[in-house]
Design a protein with these regions (language model features):
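Terminal targeting signals and extreme-terminal segments of soluble enzymes
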Residues: 1-186
Length: 186
């Protein structure tokens, strides 16, 4: 496929995902405690749970999940530019943090959570809105009882690499206090 065909396919796939998703919203912390990480994403893709609002803020969305893998699609735009006229490194970092973190999340059991301990980002090529879409794919390297690692890449529709990252995530038991089950902050 040439680049225009890939872009057209990615746009079509994005629309199919958007048609199934609820409006982005913050999910109450305790709402997903009875689900595995993979079940959370299955519920998001089925329109039963909302996707996180960060994707709406930075114009990216989850496209596909399987255990140990998470794929996001982003639209780099002028609103993401830094003073040099290219996409800000924070946009790359947030997109890749989502991909690698969610790859880890897909492997978690009921009652488990995670947080990013470290994110190492390498931006290897400048990005502008001349590239209409990019994909970020996160893949798990290792999942243990307390620590997980994953790697990710951002590529354009022509297959060019724009950035890559690794993460270390802390895995923990979700607290189950009465205030959390009532929607509080715990």
């Amino acid at each position: 496929m040439d680049v225009d065909q890939v872009v057209a396919q990615w746009i079509e796939e994005e629309q199919a995902v958007r048609d199934r998703l609820q409006a982005p919203d913050a999910m109450p912390r305790g709402q997903a405690l009875s689900l595995t990480g993979m079940e959370v994403f299955e519920a998001i893709f089925a329109g039963e749970l909302p996707p996180p609002p960060i994707g709406d803020t930075l114009d990216f969305l989850p496209m596909y999940m399987e255990p140990g893998v998470a794929v996001f699609q982003g639209r780099p735009g002028r609103r993401h530019y830094n003073p040099m006229g290219t996409v800000h490194g924070g946009w790359f970092a947030t997109l890749l943090d989502s991909a690698v973190g969610c790859a880890v999340h897909t492997t978690l059991a009921v009652g488990k959570g995670y947080t990013t301990l470290e994110l190492k980002l390498n931006v290897v090529r400048a990005l502008t809105d001349a590239v209409p879409l990019v994909r970020a794919e996160g893949k798990v390297i290792h999942v243990g009882s307390q620590v997980a690692t994953a790697e990710g890449r951002i590529v354009g529709p022509d297959g060019r690499l724009y950035a890559h990252a690794t993460t270390t995530c802390l895995i923990f038991d979700h607290p189950t206090t009465p205030s959390m089950s009532a929607g509080g902050r715990g």
